[in-house]
């Protein structure tokens, strides 16, 4: 029995019985109270019903108590505060969760949520101008893990990378590669400020010199630019794909911004919005802090993004008459929707936090309020080595690339550590600490718990083969798992699917890392108790029955740690 799911179903049934309304109960929460004095589980259903029915919350809570207290898995119910209903669950019901996980693993891990959305999640989308720096790794891991979680629970998900191959930085890339090409032909060069001085572009110049000789120098500017751009962008994308693949990340679609221009998609989108009455000619107010006299008021085409919650309408043309970046964003969103997506998720860096409202406006307008949109911001990573910050700049030619850090610590450490803080909070990544074998290193602590649980099972097979075979046959008495420490671990194990569900509901994959760290901590505490008191050991050679029960506990801990690590794309370690 999944206690969380069962209690939710029983609350829904009680809501139908008492108030003829089971739909409202779907909005109620079931949480684990921070203070154990408030029971094992708590629900806000009484306050939700009270608000709708104009009844005192405690009165509603008392009615729910009368109905629910008779349930066979409930030990007691208390009403707290303004109307929270706090449940204490019988120990045998928690213990039964262990049996359910071992005997009905796939069913236990199922999550009952609406899965009708066709989700397009765009993440990374770094400019293809060089090796991917570690600053992009956080958004890459966050987006990839979120996509994995959504897929695990049954959503249709497209993982997409938007290739910014139509902007000024691409022009700078082409100019730099042209200089490296000339250098390969023997011409002395100087890389001007503003271009890309990194040595990673030298091989591109050498390849072009071998393929074209000096022919590119005699071509007209337009033809030469086109050849170098196509070549350089593809090479940089290959580099980025490899960097991502080395992190365990693979996108389904790489979508070219330039293709929107080449296929006339921007013009088509603008005409559509004109027919919808959402494009007009007008002027924009001076930006905040700009002196009025210094601001040039110019009549231009604007999109009515304020109709959809944006702070101001957005220009779709630049001063020279070319399309603005916003115009290509409009066409790109339309393309996603035309491909069948009805829920768009954008994962952006901290430097794009000002884009949230305008992106929401784009999707609301083009989706005609029928397409969901979520914009998630990943804050900066403070990347240090021995306490010294590492500068990250492609233009300076000195930066810590994803490849550099991957070689130093490995993909699993990068993936896990990028989830050790909520995505919208800054993250400190210390290269020294992540390689330590101590409880201060969360990835080591979790992996060590997995290794230890595996070793418990291996040791039992070696020392107590008869008992081990009985365990494999399901012959264990789980009521023996009755100590406070064991019950606390079991409660946490039973909350695994609840954690996964919350990660999906709130788009917060860090909850999984936090859960694994918490589970590892409780397991290691019990392991250490066993060093001081033999009664707490997992294998007690003169107590077969208790050993059987604890083998079941160790097995479930191992399965859930492995499941959690696999969800976030980290390989569970077997030995250390």
Swiss-Prot record:
Classification via SMART domains: Arg_tRNA_synt_N, DALR_1
Keyword Nucleotide-binding carried by entry: yes
Catalytic reactions of this protein: tRNA(Arg) + L-arginine + ATP = L-arginyl-tRNA(Arg) + AMP + diphosphate
Short sequence motif named 'HIGH' region, residue ranges: 126-136
CDD domains: ArgRS_core
PROSITE patterns listed in its UniProt record: AA_TRNA_LIGASE_I (PS00178)
Superkingdom of origin organism: Bacteria
Annotated localization: Cytoplasm
Gene of this entry: argS
Annotated GO biological process: arginyl-tRNA aminoacylation
Species: Rickettsia prowazekii (strain Madrid E)
Family recorded in the similarity comment: Belongs to the class-I aminoacyl-tRNA synthetase family.
Major place of residence: cytoplasm
Entry-linked Pfam families: Arg_tRNA_synt_N (PF03485), DALR_1 (PF05746), tRNA-synt_1d (PF00750)
InterPro entries for the chain: aa-tRNA-synth_I_CS, Arg-tRNA-ligase, Arg-tRNA-synth_N, Arg-tRNA-synth_N_sf, ArgRS_core, DALR_anticod-bd, Rossmann-like_a/b/a_fold, tRNAsynth_Ia_anticodon-bd
Keyword flag Transmembrane: no
E.C. number(s) listed in UniProt: 6.1.1.19
Designated name of the protein: Arginine--tRNA ligase
Assembly mode: Monomer.
Listed GO MF terms: arginine-tRNA ligase activity; ATP binding
Keyword annotations of the record: Aminoacyl-tRNA synthetase, ATP-binding, Cytoplasm, Ligase, Nucleotide-binding, Protein biosynthesis
GO CC terms of this entry: cytoplasm
């Amino acid at each position: 029995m999944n206690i969380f799911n069962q209690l939710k179903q029983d609350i829904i049934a009680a809501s139908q019985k008492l108030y003829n309304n089971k739909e409202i109960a779907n909005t109620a929460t079931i949480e684990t109270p921070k203070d154990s004095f408030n029971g094992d589980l708590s629900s806000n259903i009484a306050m939700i019903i009270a608000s709708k029915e104009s009844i005192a919350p405690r009165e509603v809570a008392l009615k729910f108590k009368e109905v629910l207290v008779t349930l066979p898995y409930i030990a007691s119910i208390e009403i707290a505060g303004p109307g929270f209903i706090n449940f204490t669950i019988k120990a045998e019901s928690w213990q039964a969760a262990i049996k359910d996980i071992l005997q009905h693993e796939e069913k236990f891990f199922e999550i009952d949520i609406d899965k009708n959305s066709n989700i397009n999640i765009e993440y990374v989308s770094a400019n293809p101008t060089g090796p991917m720096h570690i600053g992009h790794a956080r958004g890459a891991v966050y987006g990839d893990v979120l996509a994995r979680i959504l897929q695990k629970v049954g959503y249709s998900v497209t993982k997409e990378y938007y290739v910014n191959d139509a902007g000024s930085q691409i022009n700078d890339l082409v100019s730099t590669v042209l200089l490296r090409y000339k250098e390969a032909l023997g011409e002395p060069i100087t890389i001007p400020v503003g271009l890309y001085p990194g040595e990673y572009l030298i091989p591109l110049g050498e390849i072009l010199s071998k393929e074209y000789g000096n022919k590119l120098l005699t071509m007209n500017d337009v033809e030469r630019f086109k050849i170098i751009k196509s070549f350089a962008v593809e090479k940089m994308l290959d580099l980025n794909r490899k960097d991502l693949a080395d992190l365990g990340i693979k996108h389904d679609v790489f979508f070219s911004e330039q293709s929107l221009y080449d296929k006339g998609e921007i013009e088509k989108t603008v005409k559509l919005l004109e027919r919808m009455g959402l494009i007009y000619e007008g002027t924009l107010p001076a930006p905040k802090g700009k002196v009025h006299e210094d601001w040039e008021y110019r009549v231009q085409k604007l999109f009515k993004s304020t109709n959809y919650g944006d702070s101001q309408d957005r220009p779709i043309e630049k001063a020279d008459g070319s399309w603005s970046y916003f115009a290509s964003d409009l066409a790109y969103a339309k393309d996603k929707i035309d491909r069948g997506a009805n829920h768009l998720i954008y994962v952006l860096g901290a430097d794009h936090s000002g884009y949230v409202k305008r992106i929401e406006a784009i999707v609301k307008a083009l989706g005609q309020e029928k397409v969901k949109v979520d914009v998630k911001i990943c804050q900066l990573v403070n990347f240090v080595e021995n306490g010294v910050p590492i500068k990250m700049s492609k233009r300076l030619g000195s930066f810590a690339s994803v490849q550099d850090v991957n070689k130093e610590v490995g993909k699993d450490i990068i993936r896990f550590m990028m989830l050790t803080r909520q995505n919208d909070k800054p993250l400190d990544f210390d290269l020294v600490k992540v390689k330590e074998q101590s409880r201060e290193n969360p990835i080591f602590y979790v992996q060590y718990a997995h290794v230890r649980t595996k070793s418990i099972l291996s040791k039992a097979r070696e020392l107590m083969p008869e008992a081990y075979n009985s365990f494999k046959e399901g012959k264990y008495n789980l009521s023996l798992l009755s100590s406070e420490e064991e019950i606390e671990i079991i409660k946490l194990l039973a909350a695994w699917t609840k954690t996964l569900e919350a990660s999906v509901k709130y788009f917060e994959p860090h909850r999984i890392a936090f859960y694994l760290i918490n589970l590892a901590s409780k397991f290691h505490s019990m392991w250490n108790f066993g060093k001081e008191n033999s009664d707490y050991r997992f294998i007690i050679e003169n107590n077969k029955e208790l050993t059987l029960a604890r083998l079941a506990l160790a097995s479930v801990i191992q399965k859930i740690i492995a499941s959690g690590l696999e969800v976030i794309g980290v390989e569970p370690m077997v030995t250390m």
